[in-house]
C-alpha cells in the first residue's frame, strides 16, 4: 500500500502577511498576491466579433524572489452565463534588483512567452522579449500587458496582441476584484 503524501513542507503564500515571508524583491508586486476574479471584454480582427469573458488570476510565492502566476478565462453569453473555457496560462514572474520584471508565461495552445517590464507604483507593464511557438500553434509575434491596482481590492488588466498577420492592437481588458 502506498502511504498518503505528506503535507507539502513549503506552502505558497497568497498574502503578504502569511508565511512564508515574501522575499524583499517582491515588494513592488506584493499587492498582486492572492486570487482575483472579474469580467472583461475582448476582440480581434481575426475573430467573428467582440466577446465578454470572465477571468480568474492567482499570484503566490514560496519565499523566493518570484511569483507563481496562473490565469483562467471562459467566454460568457449575452446573459453572462458561462459558454466554454477560452484561455489558460501559467508561469513565473521574476523580480530583479533594479525593479525589472521578467515573466515566463506558457499557454496550452503551444505559445510560450518571455516578457520583460517594470513594476512602477501600482502598475506593472510587460512586453514581449521572445515568443516560442509549438509547430501547430497560431502565429503570435508580440504582446503587451498592463496590470494596474486601482485600489487594494481592484485590479485592471489590458492586453494588446500582434498575431496572425495583424499589427499590435487591443485584444483584452478586464476589471477584477480580490477574492477572500
UniProtKB/Swiss-Prot annotation:
Pathway terms, separated by semicolons: Nitrogen metabolism
Organism of derivation: Streptomyces avermitilis (strain ATCC 31267 / DSM 46492 / JCM 5070 / NBRC 14893 / NCIMB 12804 / NRRL 8165 / MA-4680)
Keyword flag Iron: yes
Cofactor(s) the protein requires to work: heme b
Composition-biased stretches (Basic and acidic residues): 1-20
First-level EC class: isomerase
Residues at which heme b binds: 171
Example GO molecular function: metal ion binding
Subunit record text: Homodimer.
Name of the protein in its database record: Peroxynitrite isomerase
Recorded domain comment: Forms a 10-stranded antiparallel beta-barrel structure able to accommodate a hydrophobic ligand in its interior. In fact, this fold hosts the heme group, which is located in a wide surface cleft.
Known EC number: 5.99.-.-
Catalytic activity: peroxynitrite = nitrate
Region entry Disordered, spans: 1-21
Transmembrane segments: none
Family, similarity comment: Belongs to the nitrobindin family.
Cited InterPro entries: Calycin (IPR012674), Nb(III)_bact/plant (IPR022939), Nitrobindin (IPR045165), THAP4-like_heme-bd (IPR014878)
One matching Pfam family: THAP4_heme-bd
Annotated cofactor note: Binds 1 heme b group per subunit, that coordinates a highly solvent-exposed Fe(III) atom.
Keyword vocabulary terms for this entry: Heme, Iron, Isomerase, Metal-binding
Role of this protein: Heme-binding protein able to scavenge peroxynitrite and to protect free L-tyrosine against peroxynitrite-mediated nitration, by acting as a peroxynitrite isomerase that converts peroxynitrite to nitrate. Therefore, this protein likely plays a role in peroxynitrite sensing and in the detoxification of reactive nitrogen and oxygen species (RNS and ROS, respectively). Is able to bind nitric oxide (NO) in vitro, but may act as a sensor of peroxynitrite levels in vivo.
Species classification: Bacteria, Bacillati, Actinomycetota, Actinomycetes, Kitasatosporales
Position of sequence motif GXWXGXG: 34-40
Signal sequence segment: none
